[in-house]
């Protein structure tokens, strides 16, 4: 009997719907390129624009593009009627926690339309994510080891193969974001009732991003020196704690800590009380947060209150994460994708929030107090099955802000990409 081969979710979306509605995408023209690909494959693509930033990257002159500039309370009924009138079979968005997208998921489910969410890549770099019914901790995938082991024989690609590199990093995203927010702010009158998931003022971002560049230059030499010390074993046995963006939905929605700061202080308190005296802890600032927030004062204050930690807490900014993953004892995270990077390096990972990869056999399931003393690495066979499932099904080679590889027209072979 021939084994069923699992398809990538982009192919599953293509094969499951004729009339597809796009909501908000990532900043930039990715949704316009997605629409072109869907249209080339015979689909009818509809699009809702919610602000002038959307208009700039997906012009309202495009076929079946609708400007929604009514108030937020009117959106459920508007969407309900549109889905019914145009026989929408799939609703697609970027991020499933934005106000309009939360409503869209409910309305889609009530009308037997599938709901698909794009997200930044689970496995980075060079990947983006597409899941049905939700992403991150809202992913519907089972949190059971047996599921991924059972699915492994159905995967077309069972051995890891490096993805095609694409241009990424901060610059292409920042360029798209600056243009998006400039347009959004310049044309607020067209969308007076629009509710944004972040600060809509372009000036809110320009100053921090400028400060971020200056800080990057300031930390450059120090970061190089820290990386050399790590490689030389100067920090001895250490744990790595990668911080997340202060206003990330992963923090706001998928964990019980009120802030990244509260998470940091909780981890430091546990480390001070339970970690072996011969271990250190390295706190890694998130590069996207460089111009917005700094935790050095909090760390210094904590060390002053816990003098036994003097010389054992290291705060770093732009040292590449793999430097720490190659040498650390383990990682503590809220639910960052950095956890997956740690697991790839066979590093024990302790998750303190809700994460799609927090699965027995993959992440450490003991308490944080126990983790400091007995960190448990992932089961290699299980994690390989987990990783390959995602690379086959939920991950797409590319970067939202530069280039994404779409399957060739009219083919079910999603391993043969075109741009």
UniProtKB/Swiss-Prot annotation:
Spell out the CDD domains in the cross-references: beta_Kdo_transferase_KpsS
The keyword Membrane appears for this protein: yes
> Could you tell me the Gene Ontology terms of the biological process aspect for this record?
polysaccharide biosynthetic process; polysaccharide transport
Organism superkingdom = Bacteria
Q: Does the keyword Transmembrane apply?
A: no
Q: What is its main location?
A: membrane
Q: How does it sit in the membrane?
A: Peripheral membrane protein
Q: Which InterPro entries match?
A: Capsule_polysaccharide_synth
Keywords, sorted A to Z? Cell inner membrane, Cell membrane, Membrane, Polysaccharide transport, Sugar transport, Transport
Write down the Pfam families for this protein, in alphabetical order: Capsule_synth
> Where does the UniProt annotation locate this protein?
Cell inner membrane
Q: Name one GO cellular component term.
A: plasma membrane
| Protein role | Involved in the phospholipid modification of the capsular polysaccharide, a strong requirement for its translocation to the cell surface.
Q: What protein name is recorded for this chain?
A: Capsule polysaccharide modification protein LipB
What organism, scientifically named, is this protein from? Neisseria meningitidis serogroup A / serotype 4A (strain DSM 15465 / Z2491)
Its lineage opens with: Bacteria, Pseudomonadati, Pseudomonadota, Betaproteobacteria, Neisseriales
What gene codes for this chain? lipB
């Amino acid at each position: 009997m021939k084994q069923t081969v699992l398809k990538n979710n982009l192919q599953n979306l293509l094969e499951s719907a004729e009339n597809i509605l796009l909501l908000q995408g990532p900043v930039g023209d990715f949704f316009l390129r997605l629409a072109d690909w869907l249209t080339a494959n015979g689909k009818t693509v509809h699009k809702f624009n919610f602000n002038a930033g959307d208009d700039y990257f997906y012009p309202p002159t495009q076929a079946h593009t609708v400007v929604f500039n009514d108030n937020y309370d009117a959106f459920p009924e508007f969407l309900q009627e549109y889905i019914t009138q145009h026989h929408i079979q799939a609703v697609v968005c970027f991020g499933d926690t934005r106000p309009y997208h939360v409503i869209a998921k409910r309305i889609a489910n009530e009308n037997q339309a599938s709901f698909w969410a794009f997200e930044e890549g689970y496995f980075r770099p060079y990947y983006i994510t597409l899941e049905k019914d939700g992403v991150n901790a809202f992913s519907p995938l089972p949190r059971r080891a047996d599921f991924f082991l059972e699915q492994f024989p159905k995967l077309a690609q069972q051995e890891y193969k490096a993805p095609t590199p694409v241009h990424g990093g901060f610059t292409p995203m920042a360029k798209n974001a600056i243009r998006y927010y400039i347009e959004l702010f310049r044309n607020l009158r067209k969308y007076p009732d629009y509710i944004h998931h972040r600060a809509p003022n372009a000036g809110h971002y320009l100053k921090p991003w400028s400060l971020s560049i200056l800080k990057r230059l300031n930390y450059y030499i120090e970061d190089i020196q820290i990386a050399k010390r790590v490689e030389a074993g100067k920090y001895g046995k250490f744990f790595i704690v990668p911080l997340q963006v202060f206003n990330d939905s992963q923090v706001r929605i998928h964990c019980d800590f009120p802030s990244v700061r509260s998470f940091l202080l909780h981890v430091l308190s546990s480390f001070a009380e339970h970690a072996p005296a011969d271990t250190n802890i390295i706190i890694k600032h998130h590069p996207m947060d460089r111009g917005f927030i700094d935790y050095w004062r909090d760390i210094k204050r904590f060390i002053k209150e816990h003098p036994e930690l003097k010389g054992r807490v290291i705060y770093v900014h732009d040292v590449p994460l793999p430097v720490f993953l190659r040498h650390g004892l383990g990682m503590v995270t809220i639910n960052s994708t950095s956890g997956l990077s740690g697991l790839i390096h066979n590093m024990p990972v302790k998750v303190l929030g809700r994460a799609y990869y927090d699965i027995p056999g993959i992440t450490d399931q003991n308490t944080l107090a126990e983790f400091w003393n007995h960190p448990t690495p992932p089961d290699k066979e299980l994690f390989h099955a987990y990783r390959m499932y995602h690379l086959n099904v939920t991950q797409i080679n590319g970067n939202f802000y530069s280039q994404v590889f779409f399957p060739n027209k009219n083919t079910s072979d999603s391993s043969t990409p075109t741009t």
